[in-house]
Design a protein with these regions (language model features):
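An alpha-helical, amphipathic repeat domain used for nucleic-acid recognition
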Residues: 1-168
């Protein structure tokens, strides 16, 4: 970060706006995250709100675009399901009005494919235990899927795979 922003408190509305622009060169922020970041840096609430309003006016902060970018970043995580996506959207302070839109774009087929990948990962990690499939391993498989945000329906994929391995 430039030295002008490193230790100095933000005392004018222009300094606050410049600092906010500087932050946006690194990544997107939601309006609430930007306000919080500016206030933590020492900006007065009024200056921070003015800066965020100006950034919104010039479309530097766009909540819909931010929601889409959070979703795109989440898609790179291959082993997670629908519930994890929803939790991630809330954690990143995506506006409530955009969460259903993002959730709609994540299809059942995509979730099933991700569940399959997660199942393969679990089977690889537990390859030496597969010859003795028991309730403990099945429970571990279901916990593995649940921890990654998959529903019970998706967790059955791993149980079926474990039964297949036991039948072989």
């Amino acid at each position: 970060m430039p030295k002008a922003f490193s230790k100095n408190k933000l005392e004018t509305d222009m300094q606050v706006y410049d600092y906010a622009l500087n932050l946006l060169t690194f990544r997107d922020y939601s309006a609430s995250d930007m306000l919080l970041k500016l206030e933590r840096k020492g900006a007065e609430k009024l200056f921070a709100e003015k800066a965020v309003a100006k950034l919104k006016e010039y479309d530097f902060i766009n909540e819909k675009r931010y929601a889409q970018r959070v979703y795109e970043a989440w898609l790179s995580k291959k082993y997670y399901g629908r519930q994890h996506l929803e939790a991630e959207l809330h954690k990143k302070h995506v506006l409530e009005e955009y969460i259903p839109l993002i959730m709609e774009s994540f299809t059942e087929e995509e979730e099933a494919a991700r569940a399959e990948l997660a199942c393969q990962q679990f089977l690889q990690k537990n390859a030496r235990k597969l010859n003795q499939v028991d309730q403990k391993l099945q429970a571990a498989g279901v916990r593995f899927m649940a921890a990654r945000g998959f529903s019970g329906r998706q967790a059955y994929i791993i149980l079926d795979k474990l039964r297949e391995c036991n039948a072989d």
